[in-house]
Structure formats: C-alpha cells, structure tokens
Design a protein with these regions (language model features):
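Alpha-helical transmembrane segments and their helix-start/interface "positive-inside/aromatic belt" motifs
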Residues: 20, 58-71, 240
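Short, aromatic-rich membrane-interface segments at the entry and exit
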Residues: 36-44, 61-64
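Structural signal for the C-terminal ends of transmembrane alpha-helices
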Residues: 51-57, 132-133, 252-253
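Alpha-helical transmembrane segments and their membrane-interface exit regions
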Residues: 47-56, 71-75
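Juxtamembrane/interface alpha-helical elements of multi-pass membrane proteins
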Residues: 66-179
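Membrane-helix interface segments
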Residues: 37-38, 58-59, 147-150
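Transmembrane alpha-helix interface motif
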Residues: 1-37, 46-50, 165-259
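Hydrophobic transmembrane alpha-helix segments characteristic of membrane transport
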Residues: 43-50, 137-141
C-alpha cells in the first residue's frame, strides 16, 4: 500500500481527481500517438518533475517504484532490438548458429530505444495519477459515472483485501521461515502448500466477518460512503490545458521533423 500512502501525502492530493485523470490520460494518448523520442522524453521528465518537486514525493520512493516497470520495459526492448536473419549484412554485431544469425541492427536498435523511451513516458503518466490520487478518490469519481455501483463496490473490496491477504501471507511466511519451513526444497513445497490452504481458509473467514460487520452497521445491499470535498483548482486546470497544448505542438513538430 506504499503507493496509496505516497498519494495521500502528495501536495497534489487535494486537486480534483477528474482534473488529474483527464490531464494524465490526455498526455498519455499524445505520448503514444506521437511515437516521438522528443515527446516521450519531455513527458517523462515533466511528469517526474511534477511528482517529485510539485507533489513533494520522495525521489527515492519514485525511482524505487519505477524499477518495477523498468525491468519489463528493458526485456521488451531487448526482444525488439534482436534481429534474426540468414546473413549479418546490416547488423552492428551478431552471433550465428548454423545458417541463422542473431544480432542487433541499426534499425532494430533505434526501434527498441524509441519503444523504451515511449514506455517510460507512458508509465510516468500513470505514476503521476497513482502517486497523486488515492484509490478512494478514483472510486468516488467512478461512482459519478455510468458504471453500476455494485461493480465499483466489488472493486473496492477486492482492492482492500488484496493488501489484507498479502499482509496475512507475509506473516504466515515469516512464521514458517522462523521454524525452518523453507530449509530445503521438499520442506519448501510442503510449507507453500500449507500457506496456500491457510490463506484460503482465512479468506473465507475474513469475508464472513466482513459481511457480519457490514450487516451490523445497516448494510442493505449498497455501501454508502461520505464523499470527500473536491477542490477544483483553477491554477492546475489552466496549467493542464497549457501543458497539453504545448505537448501536442511538440508532437506535431516532431512527427513532421521525424524526430
């Protein structure tokens, strides 16, 4: 739940969720549509600037969270960079196995770098939203949409109990580890099976307790919550419009220039 904690502590937390959602999604669409190195770098740097310097989120936490998608981005880019052919004509370097060559060409390397930078830009947009807007605010926003309430309520409960069950599984694993439950492969399999079965039983017990608690508080089929006060920041809205216009202009210029 570190992302939610950082979102609650962000200086941008009280800005209207709809403003931040539209802003981040607009920039995300532009970043993907532009397919431009310049736009992607501009988006990534400015989004990180907003998160760290305006939102006052610790850069250590931000970069730690960024390592999660970075691994998948690099793996995907590596797959794009590797070319397979019958000769090593335009490859910068290659390895051959029989009559097949595996290597990296100038074109494939450029494509890989472009995709990687574009992914960084897109991920930074999503992190801007997630690190400045708690899930509670997003669920509140969804309640005002055309999505049926029961779907939103199920999503809220699932989101909440993912972390509850994760905490329970961590405690069980710690207790097992303290009793040498993972000392060798055979014992590890046995301990993992016990952890899974105990977690399943506790999940059912927790669900029953939760439903009983909700009924005792007058649950009638709908979860009623107090809507938080929404701050429609004129400054942020003006900034968002200007930013989107500038990003669009850069995208159009870069597409024409082929950057």
């Amino acid at each position: 739940m570190i992302i939610d904690k950082l979102a609650y502590n962000s200086k941008l937390r009280n800005i209207a969720p709809i403003s931040k959602l539209l802003f981040s999604m607009s920039v995300l669409v532009i970043c993907i549509w532009a397919n431009s190195f310049l736009v992607s770098v501009f988006t990534a740097l400015t989004m990180l600037f907003l998160i760290i310097f305006i939102g006052k989120t610790s850069y250590k936490n931000v970069f730690h969270l960024m390592t999660v998608p970075i691994v998948f981005i690099i793996m995907g880019a590596a797959a794009i960079a590797i070319s397979i052919g019958q000769n090593s004509g335009d490859m910068l370097f290659s390895l051959h196995f029989g009559n097949t060559y595996f290597g990296v060409s100038h074109t494939s390397l450029l494509s890989a770098v472009r995709v990687m930078i574009k992914c960084f830009g897109a991920v930074s947009c999503m992190y801007f939203l997630s690190l400045t807007t708690p899930m509670v605010d997003l669920f509140t926003l969804l309640r005002k949409s055309i999505i049926p309430n029961f779907i939103i309520e199920i999503a809220e409960l699932i989101y909440r109990y993912i972390f509850v069950l994760f905490d329970v599984s961590h405690r069980i694993h710690t207790a097992q580890d303290a009793r040498l439950g993972y000392s060798n492969l055979r014992v590890s399999y046995h301990s993992t099976a016990q952890l899974a079965s105990n977690l399943l039983i506790r999940s059912f017990n927790q669900a029953e307790k939760t439903y009983t608690a909700m009924e005792s508080r007058g649950y009638d089929g709908e979860i009623n919550v107090i809507m938080p006060k929404i701050n429609h920041s004129v400054k942020f809205n003006v900034f968002a419009v200007i930013y989107v216009v500038i990003t669009t202009a850069i995208a159009i210029f870069s597409r024409k220039a082929g950057i």
